[in-house]
Amino acid sequence: EPAWIESGFPLSLSLPFRQEPFDEETTRAFFDNLLPEQGIRAKVSKLIQISEKNVYGFLETIGGECAGALTILADGDKPQSKPAYEKISTQKLGELVSLLPRRPLLAGQDGVRLSLAGAQNKIPITYLDDQFFFPANGSPSTHIIKPSIDDLPETVENEAFCMVLAKTAGMNVPEVKILDTYPSAYMVKRYDRVIEPLSIKRIHQEDFCQAMGLPVAQKYQNEGGPGTKQCFDLLAHCENPENDRASLLT
């Protein structure tokens, strides 16, 4: 769209502005990296009855609230004019967390369109004024809830402790809080959301694989993914490369 090229922003370093459309192979890596991985994707696939390899079908179904500033809609659908939220209790939040092993991202439930990358169970939630709200139909969230990893029951405490320790050491890390839920879970504030007086603003972001145009299968260095040098080189595109490279090291 010419208007978007004039006033918008590129979705990715790997998808710079240009008049000609990109082919499917070039765009696939960016969108595939918005989706969950491994066993989580396999379970979601069964719940929504869409093939694991059908990236765009997945996003059409669950891509309402993704990482960054994107909301993926089916052709012809329009964004919500007003976000919708359901206030929930801590007990109800625990019930939602307990569903995740069987229903990752709560996929397949009416009004639920959530997608987060990674191989661990998690769900986005909105937390305002010490109250929890469930974001319906892809409304923006503010935090991410992470339960313990299967067979590793103390990961909640371990991950939260490491985050607090990093913050105490002066590192720039999001706020975390262990929740009084059963099963146990902790909450981390989203760095790609800004809470404004009357709204929640999405901040666009991408990971290294998206910025380099690499598929999910090449996320890890031992599987052909980027190493430290490639990541350092990529940060030359940032406004302040030296600071960002220092942050990467820590």
Please give the residue ranges for each predicted region.
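Phosphate/dinucleotide-binding and metal-coordinating scaffold of catalytic cores
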Residues: 1-250
